[in-house]
A protein has these predicted regions:
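Hydrophilic extracytoplasmic domains
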Residues: 19-59, 63, 218-325
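Charged, low-complexity, helix-prone segments enriched in Lys/Glu/Asp/Gln
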Residues: 66, 70, 74-75, 178-183, ...
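Acidic, serine/threonine- and glycine-rich low-complexity intrinsically disordered segments
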Residues: 129-248
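Extreme N-terminal leader/targeting regions
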Residues: 98-172, 299, 313-325
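Ordered hydrophobic segments in well-structured contexts
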Residues: 38-41, 90-94, 108-116, 124-127, ...
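Bacterial Sec-dependent N-terminal signal peptides
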Residues: 1-27
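Start-of-domain marker
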Residues: 19-132
Length: 325
């Protein structure tokens, strides 16, 4: 099952500041209590405003895609939430409207797992309509904008694939729960960015000796696979999306996979110019343990860093040197 439409943009080249809210609003004791609640998995509904915007004949294909997205996402989310959510097996599936009704009744006995959009907050430059998709695990009484915990969703648009695979759900749900468990165990809140960096630094030595799988289309056009393999200096294989996904789902031993996901919006700071774009990080995950082994998440001040959803030969040298960016 692979389906999800997000419509993210490819990177052009810019320098600027992060534009989305990455804060976790749940404190350790609140997250500990949250794990014990009955889980509501939010089912999407068609949005009347979106339907109206797409009602014109020239938008017919977009309307069709939007309606299909709702149906397909809900079907997949039901399956994979039940398969990969381990905090509880007590869950119900409710629409956003039903969850809002429970909120209005001030019912605080539920946790919610939902798809959210991290919108451009306009911290810098002109606010845009760009956003970063994420999954949130949060208290029902919390607002959508102030989720207790969240994780960015992987990007699969390199293949013009309007979808997430089972492996993508496994990656997101497993690491989101691991992030929450770390916060509880250490009595300290780390958002995903900081948590992933910490785990990568602690685990990067485990990357040595593993077979590393990279999706064929992730290598930037015009770049050399031979040079990438030479730079890595280990067992590096370029494979299809299905092969990579199968390895993660089947918990392939001594194998790791490279993922990419959007994590922010950057804007130009040039006078009289307003340009913004989505930026991406790369992450390596152990197929058997779901541990984060490596992270490449450049900040705005990392001049010349590759923030696209593709990878160059240079990043493989960074992997080989066990460096975290």
């Amino acid at each position: 099952m692979k389906r999800i439409l997000f419509g993210l943009l490819l990177l052009t080249s810019l320098v600027s500041k992060a534009q989305i809210n990455v804060t976790f609003y749940g404190e350790p004791d609140e997250l500990k209590e949250l794990k014990t609640r009955l889980l509501l998995v939010e089912i999407l509904e068609e949005n009347e405003d979106v339907l109206e915007k797409l009602s014109k004949p020239k938008k017919a294909e977009e309307l069709k895609d939007y309606k299909k997205f709702i149906v397909d996402f809900n079907a997949d989310f039901k399956v994979y939430a039940q398969k990969y959510w381990t905090f509880t097996d007590k869950m119900e599936f409710k629409t956003a409207t039903e969850i809002k009704d429970l909120q209005k009744a001030k019912n605080k006995s539920y946790a919610v797992l939902r798809l959210i959009q991290l919108n451009d907050k306009g911290y810098w430059g002109v606010r845009t309509n760009q956003n970063v998709p994420a999954l949130a695990f949060t208290r029902i009484e919390s607002s959508v904008a102030k989720a207790d915990s969240k994780i960015y969703l992987p990007s699969r648009n390199l293949n013009n694939d309007k979808s997430l695979s089972e492996a993508d759900y496994k990656y997101a749900l497993s690491i989101l729960q691991a992030n929450v468990d770390w916060i509880i165990a250490n009595n300290k809140v780390l958002n995903f960015d900081k948590y992933a960096e910490k785990m990568a630094k602690e685990n990067v030595s485990k990357l040595k000796g593993k077979t590393l799988l990279v999706e064929d289309n992730m290598l930037m056009k015009g770049r050399s696979k031979e040079q990438a393999i030479k730079n890595y200096g280990g067992d590096l294989k370029f494979v299809s999306e299905n092969e990579l996904s199968d390895a993660l789902v089947s918990k392939a031993k001594n194998t790791a996979v490279v993922y990419t996901a959007p994590y922010g919006i950057v804007k130009s700071n040039a006078p009289f110019v307003s340009v913004s774009t989505i930026v991406y990080f790369k992450i390596i995950v152990d197929c058997e343990t779901n541990e984060i082994l490596w992270l490449y998440m450049p900040g705005a001040m990392n001049w010349g860093a590759n923030m696209s959803n593709q990878i160059t030969e240079g990043e493989f040298k960074v992997m080989a040197d066990l460096k975290i960016i």
